[in-house]
């Protein structure tokens, strides 16, 4: 059980809880990711039984750390299922890229207006791409794999790397937009000054 009297308890508890979560980043718990859910538990804003991918064993680990009773998975947030990976039907894929954008760990590869595919070894089975696909080209396929702590660690690293890349890309687009806006403003100002000078002459 976590020592609640230690300094920076909430932060340290949230980190410890996060390490016990499967890192699928599925959002079934109602939060944006595993870290956010872990923090909510640490701050007593959420119960420990919202993580369906973690299953009964996951709840037991969270219970042991927090001292809370090991409740059954709350069915409102899903149910424990065998691990499954996403697979895209190439005959249905329209290349819209929505699955790529939805994947929290960068496991979907392809080019806009071309076919996309799932890198199954990187897939966490979150199912977010299934929800994002407008033509039902994505399905979840059970493959007999049992999710491990090593898988969780790899998924967490993939998630953080994907997040960093997307933030950098968004920042670059913002900078480009600002530059384009500044250039347009400069051109407009030059045109106005030229118009004024022509009127004076």
Which ranges hold each PLM region?
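Long, charged N-terminal interaction/targeting segments
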Residues: 1-71
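Ferredoxin-like iron-sulfur electron-transfer modules
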Residues: 11-23, 45-53, 72-95, 100-101, ...
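Generic secondary-structure signature for well-ordered alpha-helical cores
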Residues: 43, 64-71, 98-101, 193, ...
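Surface-exposed charge patches
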Residues: 61, 101, 131
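Short, electropositive, low-hydrophobicity segments enriched in small/polar residues
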Residues: 34, 110, 129
């Amino acid at each position: 059980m976590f020592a609640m009297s230690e300094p920076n308890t909430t932060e340290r508890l949230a980190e410890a809880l996060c390490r016990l979560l499967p890192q699928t980043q599925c959002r079934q718990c109602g939060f944006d990711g595993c870290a956010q859910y872990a923090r909510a538990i640490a701050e007593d804003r959420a119960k420990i039984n919202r993580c369906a991918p973690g299953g009964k064993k996951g709840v037991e680990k969270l219970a042991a750390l927090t001292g809370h009773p090991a409740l059954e998975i709350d069915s409102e947030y899903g149910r424990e299922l065998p691990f499954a990976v996403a697979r895209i039907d190439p005959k249905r894929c329209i290349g819209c890229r929505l699955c790529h954008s939805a994947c929290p760990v960068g496991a979907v590869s392809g080019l806009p207006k071309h076919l996309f595919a799932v890198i199954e070894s990187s897939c966490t089975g979150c199912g977010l791409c299934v929800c994002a696909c407008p033509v039902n080209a994505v399905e979840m396929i059970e493959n007999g794999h049992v999710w491990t702590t090593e898988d969780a660690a790899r998924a967490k690293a993939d998630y953080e790397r994907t997040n960093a890349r997307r933030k950098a890309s968004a920042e670059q687009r913002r900078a480009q937009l600002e530059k384009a806006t500044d250039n347009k403003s400069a051109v407009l100002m030059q045109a106005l000054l030229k118009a004024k000078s022509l009127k004076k002459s």
